[in-house]
């Protein structure tokens, strides 16, 4: 089964979930050849007893349009995360979570999925585009910020801090990087294809399933 790359962007009011809330999220699902096969986005109600981190809220004041966009048509997190997991499961391939950097976005998404649905359709794993950029570019890891990457890696898409815009822009970037990686494989005489997933992932901790009770 071919992999489907689920480019995901999260907007939040702090650095970690629980004390702070995920305000908005969006995913754009791409095939390896950059066909967009679907999107999912939602603006979420705040978590009970959570509050914005002062530094994050200071930053949000510099992005009033993006703030307004993520605070309209608010949805219940439990309902939306259940719908999101259903959407991921219906994708026509093995879903791979993709983000730049994955450490931030996957932390929020994994926490919300586990809390409100008890499972993650991505298992425990996320593909970090920053690490991928390091491997492709030869730049040191901390230098792998978007302004330092080759301009021809990017499509002419906006980065607005509106989750869906950013998920689409990031997904196109990933597919361009994936194409470059495939070219490198071809130059080495290796098959010019994305290797298919073979078996479902085992839990990261022996004896622990990635599914837990949502009660």
What are these model-derived regions, one by one?
Residues 9-11, 31, 105, 128, ...:
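Acidic active-site catalytic centers that drive phospho-/nucleotidyl reactions
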Residues 116-121, 139-147, 181:
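Substrate-binding/catalytic groove segments of enzymes
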Residues 32, 83-86, 90, 107, ...:
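Residue-level signal for well-ordered alpha-helical scaffold segments within enzymatic catalytic domains
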Residues 46, 57-61, 127-168:
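Active-site-proximal helix-loop-helix substrate-binding element of RNase H-like nuclease domains
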Residues 96-102, 107-108, 145-206:
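Acidic, Mg2+-coordinating catalytic module of metal-dependent nucleases/exonucleases
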Residues 9, 120-121, 133:
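Short His-centered aromatic/hydrophobic patch
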Residues 88, 103-124:
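Substrate-recognition/cap helix-loop segment adjacent to the acidic, metal-dependent catalytic center
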Residues 2-6, 11-100:
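Conserved non-catalytic scaffold segment of RNase H-like nuclease domains
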């Amino acid at each position: 089964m071919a992999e489907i790359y689920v480019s995901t962007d999260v907007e939040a009011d702090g650095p970690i979930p629980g004390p702070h809330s995920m305000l908005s999220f969006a995913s754009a699902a791409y095939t390896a050849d950059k066909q967009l096969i679907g999107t999912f986005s939602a603006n979420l109600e705040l978590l009970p007893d959570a509050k914005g981190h002062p530094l994050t809220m200071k930053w949000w004041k510099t992005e009033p349009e993006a703030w307004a966009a993520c605070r309209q048509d608010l949805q219940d997190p439990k309902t939306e995360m259940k719908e999101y997991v259903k959407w991921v499961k219906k994708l026509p391939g093995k879903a791979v979570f993709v983000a730049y950097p994955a450490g931030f976005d996957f932390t929020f998404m994994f926490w919300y999925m586990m809390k409100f649905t008890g499972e993650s359709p991505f298992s425990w794993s996320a593909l970090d585009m920053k690490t991928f950029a390091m491997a492709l570019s030869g730049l040191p890891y901390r230098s792998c910020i978007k302004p330092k990457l080759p301009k021809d890696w990017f499509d002419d898409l906006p980065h607005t801090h509106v989750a869906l815009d950013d998920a689409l822009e990031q997904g196109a970037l990933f597919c361009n990087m994936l194409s470059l990686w495939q070219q490198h494989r071809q130059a080495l005489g290796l098959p010019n294809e994305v290797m298919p997933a073979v078996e479902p992932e085992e839990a990261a901790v022996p004896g622990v399933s990635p599914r837990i009770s949502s009660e």
